Amino acid sequence: MASKMVEIVSKMFIKPSSPTPQSLRRYNLSSIDQTIDSEVTSLAFFYTYNPSHESSKIGDLLKNSLSKTLVSYYQFAGRLIENDYIDCNDEGVEFVEVRIHGRMNDILKRGKSFATDLVLPTRIIALHEDSLLIVQLSHFDCGGIAIGFGASHKVSDGVSNVMFMKDWASSTSLSTFHKPTPLLTADSIFPPEDNKLLSNKSIVSFQQCLGKRFVFSTEAIEKLKSKAIEYGIQKPSRVEVVTAFLCQCAANCDLPRKKPYAIISAVNLRPYLALPQNSIGNIFSFYFCINDEGMDNQFSALISKLRNGKQKLLENIISKEKLTYESQMQELTKCLDQLNISSLDTYFCSSWCRFPVYDIDFGWGKPILVSPFQPHVKDLILLMDSPEGDGIEALITMEEKKMAAFEKNEELRSFAYLDSPEPEALIIPEEDKSFE
């Protein structure tokens, strides 16, 4: 059904508007790049119809500005050579333009996940095999558009992707082009290692899962904070309380087994390494905590354990080698051995809260919705600000059986609501036929 709604208009590769110098031809992967999974970070940006921009001209406008932006982000236009470096050969990024037969408002009523799936490139999971970045421009019948973006995690993290989109948007909206100035220095911060010495063990599990969204209002978040304070937690953050609460609810799905579990949380290292936000690459690490103490009073204990895990990671800032994937995996294995735990569930958590994704304006206004999509990662908890900016949306992916139990959890439903297939209608301006 969904595939019949999407009509491919064109496919092409966009190359940098000027050739990459020979001196920049080799882009070395950092040690974090080398050890990270070959997954894709994807985002979809939805924009309502703006009568000041003809739909038929938006494609050419975006292609032109993308070509200029790639001069600074030349690594995206290259090709991955084994697990060693990127050959910045200017072969380009794939740009797909499609027509979606339906109005944006009607499609969003069927659920954000459904709409997001439509506007992201269908080849997005196998991205790293050729193009390191794919863009899909989707035109809706109402004149609204969506820009779907997918980048190989071998090249960039979430912060890098947002910076790229901001620079591309600025290149599109400004009358005078201002060349972006990203800092491509990740390999100097985390020097590459011999591939033969690297572990192949993954911290995430890739399989078919269900993805659902749960929304926490400002009031619900404040109640969770108050609950944490009652248990002695000092100044709990919104991300801390939502993360701990969701992991607690997910773990309770396994009752009565009371299986131990780990929480692995990603952290942006730029502020802690005194790096500017325009430092591009995989500049993050992760910290973890293990809960093997049963199900009683998990909430406050989890927050404390998460804080301790993060503090332990940040104590290693000076000796950067202890921030790498390898060292953290070794530490996790060591802890499991000490606790005599042979197997456990693992929840992989990441927060994109406070990322300025709703400020990305290509010249036709800010997006009404920014949505990630990553349904192939088991037990993923991804947090984002709600479109209004005051609540939190949690994208949860689980196996189907576990998800069925999770969404019925009474405590969960008392603090969060499931993003239903019929959300409150968004007001879409009058229809634009200029693309036809």
UniProtKB/Swiss-Prot annotation:
Main location class: cytoplasm
Q: In which tissues is it expressed?
A: Confined to roots.
GO BP terms in the entry: indole alkaloid biosynthetic process; response to jasmonic acid
Cysteine disulfide partners in this protein: none
* Induction and repression of expression: Induced by jasmonic acid (MeJA).
Give one GO term, molecular function aspect: acetyltransferase activity
Tell me its EC number(s), please. Answer: 2.3.1.-
Q: Which PANTHER family match?
A: ACYLSUGAR ACYLTRANSFERASE 3-LIKE, F21J9.9
Q: What does this protein do?
A: Component of the monoterpenoid indole alkaloids (MIAs, e.g. echitovenine, tabersonine, lochnericine, 19-hydroxytabersonine and horhammericine) biosynthetic pathway; MIAs are used in cancer treatment and other medical applications. Acyltransferase catalyzing the conversion of horhammericine to 19-O-acetylhorhammericine, of 19-hydroxytabersonine to 19-O-acetyltabersonine and of minovincinine to echitovenine.
> What is the protein's name according to its record?
Tabersonine-19-hydroxy-O-acetyltransferase
The protein's organism comes out as: Catharanthus roseus (Madagascar periwinkle)
Q: What is the lineage of its organism?
A: Eukaryota, Viridiplantae, Streptophyta, Embryophyta, Tracheophyta
